[in-house]
Amino acid sequence: MREKYLLHCPGCGRLFPDNYTLDCPLGCNALLRTVYAEHRLTLRDLPGIFRYSSWLPIEGHLRIDAGPVSYASEGLARELGLSNLTVTFSGYWPERGGRMETCSFKELEAQPTVLRLGEKGAGVLQISSAGNTGRAFCQVSALTGAPVVVVVPASAADRLWTTVPAPNVCLITVEGDYSDSIAFGREVCSLPGIVPEGGAKNVARRDGMGTVMLDAALFAGRLPDAYFQAIGSGTGGIAAWEAAERLVADGRFGSRLPTLHLSQNLPFVPMVRAWEAGRREIVPEVDMPDAEASIVRVSADVLTNRHPPWEVRGGVYDALAASGGRMYAVANDDTRSAGRLFEATEEIDLDPAAAVAVASLIRAAEEGFIGPDDHILLNVTGGGYARAAEDLDRYPVEPYLRVRAGEAFAGDVRDAVRGWLAEQEVVVRA
């Protein structure tokens, strides 16, 4: 292979070059994967996430020093009776080297995605988000000047801020929930020049998140026995599985895939219900009855994706099945108590979604799903908000447009976005 990497479709087995490709050209219902020329992980002398660029679908790098940070837990590990607990932290914690200024692991996705589009495609990225992903892409836009269109629920608008001004962001707020934002974002991409970020289909997003597994394995010198993360779409779980398979093929980190322990926040737990029923399909009326009311009641609303990549080839179901995985439904009270325990023992505050993962770890330890000497990886997907508020400037991203639930992307709304796009002076692929 002369190229750094190719894309592989697990449906038909075809290999092909990347042109910011999100789907198999033959129409397979499968998530494309990257196949890298380097089968052994080689570290680069580059900042942040880009030290792992040999296994990222990019050619260059950004001058952003933000990546995952792994360390051996003492306080939480002692509290839970675990002798080998590795925490990989993605957030703001300068004493530990954590420099994700938006306090979320979504920066691991945003950095390589923005770079990949610039290298392999053309146009302006569109991102639909419940808050954290949108904030991460706004931050990368602020630091690089890359224009982005971000669509979020109106209730999440206050989560959109950056640590330096972000003049190249078109923020659209939608009355409704995360799924309404996804639907409207899809319509925005009908405008020539606006490109969907791709979600789980985006290999840069998954491989960026996969650096959590790479960082932890390098720190511990081996793959973990068990991996804990809270999920909304489940893309992070897929990313962990894919990265672990690459590390197994590398040969230096062990031959056994980690068991995935993935969690959702009650009462919105469609993937938990489908998994416990042994179903590859999510049945909305069974797995997420009264979805809107359930979404309103969760503590971690970033975990409320109504259309996760569950049944697709290479999706969440396959990741759980391949690893002998387990899922957890975590109540709000348990989430809050887990967050307090982590802050008391590890001395940093958590994002609510990360607290869901901690709660699942507590349950697994109490119920014997993991052993005291097992090597455990806890993926802390966000935290350090209090410290960031003390140390960093914060610039709110003001909405460019506000739209009603169900409003069509037409007329004045479409014209406004077209006008913004014209001001960006970006290359638009014919």
Curated annotation (Swiss-Prot):
Function: Specifically catalyzes the beta-elimination of phosphate from L-phosphoserine and the beta-addition of sulfite to the dehydroalanine intermediate to produce L-cysteate.
Recorded catalytic activity of this chain's protein: O-phospho-L-serine + sulfite + H(+) = L-cysteate + phosphate
Positions bound to pyridoxal 5'-phosphate: 132, 381
Transmembrane portions of the chain: none
Protein's UniProt name: Cysteate synthase
Biological processes per GO annotation: coenzyme M biosynthetic process
Quaternary structure note: Homotrimer.
Pathway per the UniProt entry: Cofactor biosynthesis; coenzyme M biosynthesis
UniProt modified residues of type N6-(pyridoxal phosphate)lysine: 106
Family, similarity comment: Belongs to the threonine synthase family. Cysteate synthase subfamily.
